[in-house]
Regions:
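Acidic, divalent-metal-coordinating active-site segment for phosphoryl/phosphodiester hydrolysis
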Residues: 134-135, 194
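Non-catalytic nucleic-acid-binding/docking modules located in mid-to-C-terminal regions
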Residues: 49-53, 143, 155-258
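Noncatalytic, basic helical substrate-engagement surface that gates or grips nucleic-acid strands
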Residues: 2-130, 136-153, 229-233, 239-257
């Protein structure tokens, strides 16, 4: 059986870059990408994959911006020196034997979701996603495992339930309810993690919650009814797009160990 390692590329690159307190500079970018390359190598050494998917955001507007103009409006842009250094970094990854996938109009999350689900559907073996991004943890429900490279820990079904109070299959509904400030996804006013998790444990799904909201006489019921449209828009925004035309074959992602 095979083993797919999907790497959320910018999740690693940006965290390494931002961990350094120095001001933005070409030297800072060079050092950060050198460390990021070591992280990629360590991931491959530690997980011994048969296939590797290094996925990176292409940049610019995506299908989510078309749905909601305010998407990610509060997120700080990538430092220019780091963005300018990425093409050379991709070349270094290619020289290392990796096939970088970076597609316009979609995010790396969508590419990873598409490829991981296809891999699992074809029963090709284990799928590991190297990321700290909460959006990708919904893939745990389909049989993937998430690896936090920075904490060296596995995130499985039990970890997700302990962290968020719901199983991974309910994570998109949870994020839709509570919103996600990182991506400027509004969610429902004054609904935080605990309230969102309690609603999902009680009702099970977003649709069931909204059906029940019709008889709730308290402020929460009123808010849910009032913000129904934004809630379902938020649900679309947090949902992974899993039908991306990735344009690579399994052979292109195959990893030949030295």
């Amino acid at each position: 059986m095979g083993r797919l390692l999907a790497i959320d590329g910018l999740n690693i690159v940006r965290r390494v870059y931002e961990a350094s307190p120095e001001p933005d500079s070409d030297l800072k970018a060079e050092i950060a990408l050198r460390h990021a390359l070591s992280s990629f190598r360590n991931l491959i050494t530690d997980h011994q994959p048969t296939h590797v998917l290094p996925a990176f955001d292409f940049g610019g507007a995506t299908w989510r911006h078309q749905l909601y103009a305010g998407y990610r409006e509060g997120r700080a842009p990538m430092p220019g020196v780091l963005r300018e250094a990425l093409p050379e970094f991709y070349q270094r990854l290619a020289g290392f034997g990796l096939r970088v996938v970076s597609l316009p109009d979609v995010e790396a999350d969508d590419v990873i979701g598409t490829v991981v689900l296809r891999w699992l559907a074809e029963d090709r073996g284990a799928a590991v996603v190297a990321t700290t991004d909460k959006d990708l943890h919904c893939l745990v429900a389909q049989g993937a495992l998430v690896w936090d490279h920075f904490k060296s820990e596995w995130h499985d079904h039990a970890w997700c339930e302990k962290k968020w109070g719901v199983p991974p299959e309910q994570l998109p509904d949870l994020l839709a309810l509570m919103g996600d400030a990182t991506d400027s996804i509004p969610g429902v006013s004054k609904v935080g993690l605990k309230t969102a998790a309690k609603l999902l444990r009680t009702y099970g799904t977003l649709d069931a919650i909204m059906a029940g909201a019709g008889i709730l006489k308290d402020t929460l019921g009123e808010t849910l009814r009032k913000e129904r449209e934004m809630l379902y828009l938020s649900r679309q925004l947090v949902q992974l797009k899993t039908d991306v035309r990735v344009g690579v074959s399994w052979n292109m992602l195959a990893w030949e160990s030295a």
